[in-house]
Amino acid sequence: MAAREVFKRVIPPLSTRLHKGQSGRIGVVGGSLEYTGAPYYAAMAALYTGVDLCHVFCAQDAAPAIKCYSPELVVHPSIVSKRDCEHLNPVAIDNCIETAVDRMSPLLCRLDSLVVGPGLSRDPVMLAMAKRIVEKVISLGTPLVIDADGLCLVEQTPGLVMGYQNVILTPNTNEFKRLCHSVNIDASENCEVAAVQLSKALGSVTILCKGSKDLIATGDDILFVSDPTSLRRCGGQGDVLAGILCAFLAWRNGYQSGRWTAQDQSTDISLMIVASNASSFARKCAALAFEKHKRSIVASSILKEIGPAFDSLYDDEL
């Protein structure tokens, strides 16, 4: 069965019987003083795709801007940054991080999926806290997307996601090379071979390598997504993909728990199916936006095409 037809099973129905939250509660960890757009794009992409609620966990410096971008988002200035800890010693900083993660825990436990990285920056304190959050959600079994600056955590500590079968890494070309280097893999020649080696080195996690053709690898399994897309790469495009992917993982989680249908274990909705559908869908959104805007395309242009693209690919029977 085609990947798209299989994935349609996890899409929640449009029904008055569902209440708020059943179609997905997701979170975005990211947003710093310099980077407030990235978490916004990821969060709004998930909402436009069709999840019900999105929580953005960001630095205090980023919260006012993100709140002003959209009233649809629930924004928590929860992430401790270096600016918050300028006069603290390392032990005090660590205690501050632990306290902040503990305060987030009740919300983290309720999420259907989480994306870590958009706009996170290279702030060492924010990265340290993001690492604790990743450890927490892995202990909960929560589906996880690690993108952008969040991938620095995996570069620094490859064991962080080792063997976790509910995570998708979404590196671009340069991030992919750095991830490969962190586990002594040569990515300079054959990208397919390197992707398989990287996935296996991390315990067969799923990797979605973004490029002119998106490459998805889980262990020895590999596939390409080469659907038409925008001919111009704009800032925020990867954040949109991360948000879509997070939404799709949330739906998979809801489907597997029998939230809107009887539990059906007869068909395994693998992370490769989820990733390939997210890739294809994001490329369709970008292609529609490019048709209208050409060189003027920006990430907000792509957000506006999520609804039409979804109708075209998945809701064509409505």
Curated annotation (Swiss-Prot):
<keyword id="KW-0547">Nucleotide-binding</keyword>
<comment type="similarity">
    <text>Belongs to the NnrD/CARKD family.</text>
</comment>
<keyword id="KW-0520">NAD</keyword>
<dbReference type="GO" id="GO:0047453">
    <property type="term" value="F:ATP-dependent NAD(P)H-hydrate dehydratase activity"/>
</dbReference>
<keyword id="KW-0597">Phosphoprotein</keyword>
<feature type="binding site">
    <location>
        <begin position="229"/>
        <end position="238"/>
    </location>
    <ligand>
        <name>ATP</name>
    </ligand>
</feature>
<protein>
    <recommendedName>
        <fullName>ATP-dependent (S)-NAD(P)H-hydrate dehydratase</fullName>
        <ecNumber>4.2.1.93</ecNumber>
    </recommendedName>
</protein>
<keyword id="KW-0067">ATP-binding</keyword>
<dbReference type="GO" id="GO:0005524">
    <property type="term" value="F:ATP binding"/>
</dbReference>
<keyword id="KW-0963">Cytoplasm</keyword>
<dbReference type="InterPro" id="IPR017953">
    <property type="entry name" value="Carbohydrate_kinase_pred_CS"/>
</dbReference>
<dbReference type="GO" id="GO:0005737">
    <property type="term" value="C:cytoplasm"/>
</dbReference>
<keyword id="KW-0456">Lyase</keyword>
<feature type="binding site">
    <location>
        <begin position="172"/>
        <end position="178"/>
    </location>
    <ligand>
        <name>(6S)-NADPHX</name>
    </ligand>
</feature>
<dbReference type="InterPro" id="IPR029056">
    <property type="entry name" value="Ribokinase-like"/>
</dbReference>
<feature type="binding site">
    <location>
        <position position="239"/>
    </location>
    <ligand>
        <name>(6S)-NADPHX</name>
    </ligand>
</feature>
<feature type="binding site">
    <location>
        <position position="119"/>
    </location>
    <ligand>
        <name>(6S)-NADPHX</name>
    </ligand>
</feature>
<comment type="function">
    <text>Catalyzes the dehydration of the S-form of NAD(P)HX at the expense of ATP, which is converted to ADP. Together with NAD(P)HX epimerase, which catalyzes the epimerization of the S- and R-forms, the enzyme allows the repair of both epimers of NAD(P)HX, a damaged form of NAD(P)H that is a result of enzymatic or heat-dependent hydration.</text>
</comment>
<keyword id="KW-0521">NADP</keyword>
<dbReference type="GO" id="GO:0110051">
    <property type="term" value="P:metabolite repair"/>
</dbReference>
<dbReference type="InterPro" id="IPR000631">
    <property type="entry name" value="CARKD"/>
</dbReference>
<feature type="binding site">
    <location>
        <begin position="210"/>
        <end position="214"/>
    </location>
    <ligand>
        <name>ATP</name>
    </ligand>
</feature>
<dbReference type="GO" id="GO:0046496">
    <property type="term" value="P:nicotinamide nucleotide metabolic process"/>
</dbReference>
<feature type="domain" description="YjeF C-terminal">
    <location>
        <begin position="3"/>
        <end position="313"/>
    </location>
</feature>
<dbReference type="Pfam" id="PF01256">
    <property type="entry name" value="Carb_kinase"/>
</dbReference>
